[in-house]
Amino acid sequence: GLWEKVKEKANELVSGIVEGVK
């Protein structure tokens, strides 16, 4: 569903931010 896609994108964003901080 739509919510699953939204959560998926949020996880990608968070992962990208975490990688940038390292």
UniProtKB/Swiss-Prot annotation:
UniProt-annotated location(s): Secreted
GO terms under biological process: defense response to bacterium
An annotated GO cellular component: extracellular region
Record's keyword terms, sorted: Amidation, Amphibian defense peptide, Antibiotic, Antimicrobial, Secreted
Main location: secreted
Tissues in which the protein is found: Expressed by the skin dorsal glands.
Modified residues (Lysine amide): K22
Key word Secreted present: yes
Similarity remark: Belongs to the frog skin active peptide (FSAP) family. Caerin subfamily.
Primary role: Shows significant activity against Gram-positive organisms, but is less effective against Gram-negative organisms.
Protein name: Caerin-3.5
Taxonomic source organism: Ranoidea gracilenta (Dainty green tree frog)
